[in-house]
Amino acid sequence: GHVMQTATGSARTFEARDSAADTLARLRGMDADALWVVYHDYAGLGRAKAVPRGRFEEVAREGVTFAMANWDLAITDEQVPHPIFGADSGDFRAVPDPSTLVALPHRPGVAQAFSRLTDDTGAAWVGDPRARLVAQVVRLDALGVAVKVAFEAEFVVVQGTDPEALHSDLGRMFAVEGLDGRWSMGARILDDLDAVGVAVHQFAKEYGPGQFEISLLPADPLRAADHFLLARQLIRAAARAEGATASFMPKPFADVAGNGLHVHLGLTRADDPNVDLVADRDDASALAETAGPAIAGLLAHAAGQSALASPTANSYKRLLPGSWAPAHVSWAIGNRAALIRVPGRGAGRHLEVRGGDAGMNPYLHLTGLLAAVADGVEKHLAVPPPAEVDV
């Protein structure tokens, strides 16, 4: 357990010893009537079972049971071709992770937790996306690299179910009117995220009709992915409360701006968070030594990574040349058409990965990104020259 303890606080999740007692204590403190135990499948869909107060003790310890065959379901709930898990493949358990327990602001009396996944025997299950992410955090830690992650998500809000209603929305990019027209929803989102401990950087009207963007503050990778999924859930609920629908679909309408999910990666020295591994300490316009191999690793694995970052057919309707979304594998210092962008100067400098959308499972996307960074650092990969034109 020592390595995990030192690599990241969130890795303690996967040390099951004290988690049941911790879960129970927190549930009692919340005075919850029901607990929603949630895991996210490979399509990034939250799946859950609700348990009543009388079963809290048992579920805190044992978790809830799901059929392994659930992993074969696509985002449409159709079984994928050539499924890995048959009807005879048994069960897995979702055990509440106490560090993720929240009281749902829009559902009084309901507590919710994300999960550690185990097999029938209670041993950690190899297919758990959260555990796979923690393993890459530990790998980078051994290379002397610590990572902070911030998600930036776009979504569209449609009133009722009429897509034509979208086009009557006149709020322009960052327009005050756009923000004002939806402020009861915006205020609800900010209040609810604050209540569950998700730290927001900013919320704004985006380019497309009915389109908004929310940026979250940096956190360790596991926490950042947890927070994005919680934010997505609460944003959808806030829109529903206003009689509207919030959609994170990559390209919901052909002629309207698509929705991206950008990932910002900050790299520091594992033993000294004050040493930035992206920005050069002495030259604000230069990159630090580790940034080159990190970017090279991200580019080397970009094609494979797209299966994790933008996993739906709809994703590729967004990723077109000339669309401000990355259609090619490239990197640049400021260019917003590049796949890997290096925004910021000095201490604020970091890596922004622009290819993804909310059809992803963010744990798997981050697992792939961190593995690519680790590969670049381990192999001392050389970074190609930056692209400075709109690609």
Residue spans of the language-model regions?
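A generic structural motif
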Residues: 41-43, 118-124, 178, 218-224, ...
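Accessory "access/gating" subregions that flank catalytic or transport cores
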Residues: 178-182, 186-189, 194-200, 214-221, ...
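Short, hydrophobic beta-strand segments
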Residues: 113-119, 212-218, 265
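Core alpha/beta catalytic barrel or barrel-like domain that forms the active/cofactor pocket
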Residues: 148-159, 166, 196-216, 246-262, ...
